[in-house]
Amino acid sequence: LKHAPAIIILVIHFLIFAIVNQFLNPHPDMLDHWVWSRYLSLSYYEHPPMIAWLIRGITLIGGNTETALEVGSQLLTISIIALTYAGTFRLYGTKAALVTLLILCSMPYFTLGSIFLHITQPFLIFWVAALFLLIRFHQQPEKKWLLWIGIAAGLGALSKYIMLLFYLGLFIHLLLYRKTRKEILNPWLYAAGIISLAIFVPVLLWNAQHDWISFRWQLGKGTSGADFGENTLAFTLGHLLLFSPLWALMGGLGSGG
């Protein structure tokens, strides 16, 4: 019963935004990806294929309806929050995990951002999973955790290209963390990378057949153009607000006043 409060919070969160969804028009991005799911491919011009594959699976199970996608979106959001809760509980115990859960449930990303399916949801599931698997490896340095990291990172890369930066962060982390610096030479770390690469092969094959258009578009979008860097401040502030728990704090202060 020690997880009962967390389960209640997650159920309430799900019900609130599942109901809110019924009064909103579907988001254009979700509709775009819904179209992708009707024409399955190894990858797509804008993004890797996970979101399209996921939507196809959801519609096969729940029907080809907006409601099925909206419920699927809520379940993905709940999965991210629950996974983070579980990892925090394992590391720091019930109190810290519950506080983490409440903070996540107060963030606009996990409230308003849960009303439509988008590519970041599966990406975050695999990123969080890979992160906690890395922590588990530090606690219990067995090769199986590295291999699971390889699977999680590969699936994350099938969801969003930025997951490829996980390995960059991992190597920097190992170099800076003296106790695990020797793991740079661990062959199982590179086996994990090979697993990730194998999972990512569909994207590579599709891009090879299409003149690497997706990679070229992503790189061009981020590093070129007359307005490059122009909106950096707005982008940064926007994301800080999107992932900020200040909304809950402001609400608490308001109700207290």
Named regions from a protein language model:
Residues 90-95, 130-145, 253-257:
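Membrane-interface transmembrane helices that cradle and orient dolichyl/undecaprenyl
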Residues 3, 84-106, 125:
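Transmembrane-helix signature of polytopic, membrane-embedded enzymes
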Residues 7, 71-92, 129-133:
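Transmembrane-helix motifs of polytopic, lipid-linked glycan transferases
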Residues 20-33, 42-54, 63-67:
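Extracytoplasmic catalytic/substrate-binding loops of multi-pass membrane glycan-assembly enzymes
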